């Protein structure tokens, strides 16, 4: 049977799979549309296995909050390219995961990945189906549940790549959201100096001492230099020490104090942070794509 362009188009519309994958499935099933769909679903797991080694550095973050605003889940799902992240298939998958996370409130990614969907499929099976549809490796990278009984929760998303959740004691939702926005922009490592390790502070101080002594300035002046640099270092990496992005004349520490509030915790997710992207030259990249098309 001749595999027409209209058959390939129909199969693509029904499966969201690539053109060559659709044509191959129709060829193997002699143009039987339903058999081709079954074949593509069956081969999905095998394709997912082959794609599993590919680096996923693009993606989306998703935040879901309960009706009573006492529970929030935040998750990151990755793909290989930003092209896939803009597609309805991937966006729908991430939306489904966000709903599932809020429903199950997992304590870690391992617990989340062990969940079963309403249709009886495992989450891994659902992931493999998405991989078969979009033709890229998909990774459900991380998830976190944040709960509070009496605190105030604030959330902020910068586009689809950065998401922040803050929990305040005192204050209100406007303040909580403002602080979440600040965290998105300024990336503090912790709330206050009390959370910094002694090892980190001593290591930084040793560096500053060495630099100051190399300046050959008087000892009393060197001490002032070290104190000043340590204070600047601490302020730059702690939330309370940072200057508020909406009002550079005040620090976050002073802001929460003036509102009779405290920051109890925060979570910041940024797509791809900590993932090393493999460097490839253009020729290697083209060859890899050709080889990938041949094996898929």
Curated annotation (Swiss-Prot):
The keyword Cytoplasm applies. Associates with the EF-Tu.GDP complex and induces the exchange of GDP to GTP. It remains bound to the aminoacyl-tRNA.EF-Tu.GTP complex up to the GTP hydrolysis stage on the ribosome. Belongs to the EF-Ts family. GO terms for cellular component: cytoplasm. The keyword Cytoplasm applies. The gene is tsf. It comes from Ruthia magnifica subsp. Calyptogena magnifica. One of its GO terms (molecular function) is translation elongation factor activity. Pfam families: EF_TS. Signal peptide: none annotated. This is Elongation factor Ts.
